[in-house]
Amino acid sequence: MHFLTIYPNCSSGVVRAQSRTEQKNPLGLDDLGIQNLGQTVSLAPAVEAASMLKMEPLNSTHPGTAASSSPLESRAAGGGSGNGNEYFYILVVMSFYGIFLIGIMLGYMKSKRREKKSSLLLLYKDEERLWGEAMKPLPVVSGLRSVQVPLMLNMLQESVAPALSCTLCSMEGDSVSSESSSPDVHLTIQEEGADDELEETSETPLNESSEGSSENIHQNS
């Protein structure tokens, strides 16, 4: 049964396999010429790796805590930057969405204005066309009107003449009645005047006769 002894401080990195006899004779019996008891094995890479593994835990006490704390810090920093990026992304998306909506509204308003302008132009053209159609038969209409005007005047004269005659008749009747009433008044006035004169004339003879009779009476007495 062989045992391996590792010498980490050995520069050559030689590992020596010892037997039980060598373990019992630690004084170095190999100096006596006994070479079959031990075999030299070159395990330099394995020894270096083992020595590094043994040295790293000794030297990495503080860096271990630093390494354990650094992922937390990196995660916290990554979380903060991630939140900032998310907010920025949301703002960018909302701004693009708002710009898109504003563009849609502006396009809709422009289309409505164009439709209104086109409708106004169509109405204007229709009115011009109707006005032109109405203005074309004006000479014929003027001729017809020139023919119809005398007829209308005749009709008006025929319709107005009876009314005028009726009004004239009524006015004449009023004047005749007024004239007939005025001679009656004059006659009554004249009759009253004649009656007064007759009374005066009748009174004067009576007075004279009474005076004469009174004188005769005085004379007879």
Swiss-Prot record:
Residues 58-72, 203-221 have a biased composition (Polar residues). It is a single-pass membrane protein. The keyword Ion transport applies. Residues 192-202 have a biased composition (Acidic residues). Residues 1-86 are extracellular. The keyword Cell membrane does not apply. One of its GO terms (biological process) is potassium ion export across plasma membrane. InterPro entries: K_chnl_KCNE (IPR000369). GO terms for cellular component: apical plasma membrane; voltage-gated potassium channel complex. Glycans are attached at N9. Residues 58-77, 175-221 are annotated as: Disordered. Disulfide bonds: none annotated. One of its GO terms (molecular function) is potassium channel inhibitor activity. Predominantly expressed in embryo and adult uterus. Low expression found in kidney, small intestine, lung and heart. The chain crosses the membrane at residues 87-107. Keywords: Glycoprotein, Ion channel, Ion transport, Membrane, Potassium, Potassium channel, Potassium transport, Transmembrane, Transmembrane helix, Transport, Voltage-gated channel. Residues 108-221 are cytoplasmic. It comes from the Eukaryota. It is found in: Membrane. Ancillary protein that functions as a regulatory subunit of the voltage-gated potassium (Kv) channel complex composed of pore-forming and potassium-conducting alpha subunits and of regulatory beta subunits. KCNE4 beta subunit modulates the gating kinetics and enhances stability of the channel complex. Associates with KCNQ1/KVLTQ1 alpha subunit to inhibit potassium currents. Belongs to the potassium channel KCNE family. PANTHER family: POTASSIUM VOLTAGE-GATED CHANNEL SUBFAMILY E MEMBER 1, 3, POTASSIUM VOLTAGE-GATED CHANNEL SUBFAMILY E MEMBER 4. Forms heterooligomers with KCNA3, inhibiting its activity by impairing localization to the cell membrane. The stoichiometry of KCNA3 and KCNE4 in the heterooligomers are 4:1, 4:2, 4:3 or 4:4 respectively. Increasing the number of KCNE4 subunits steadily slows the activation KCNA3 and decreases its abundance at the cell membrane. However, a single subunit of KCNE4 is sufficient for the cooperative enhancement of the inactivating function of the channel. However, a single subunit of KCNE4 is sufficient for the cooperative enhancement of the inactivating function of the channel. This is Potassium voltage-gated channel subfamily E member 4. It comes from Homo sapiens (Human). The lineage of its organism: Eukaryota, Metazoa, Chordata, Craniata, Vertebrata. The gene is KCNE4.
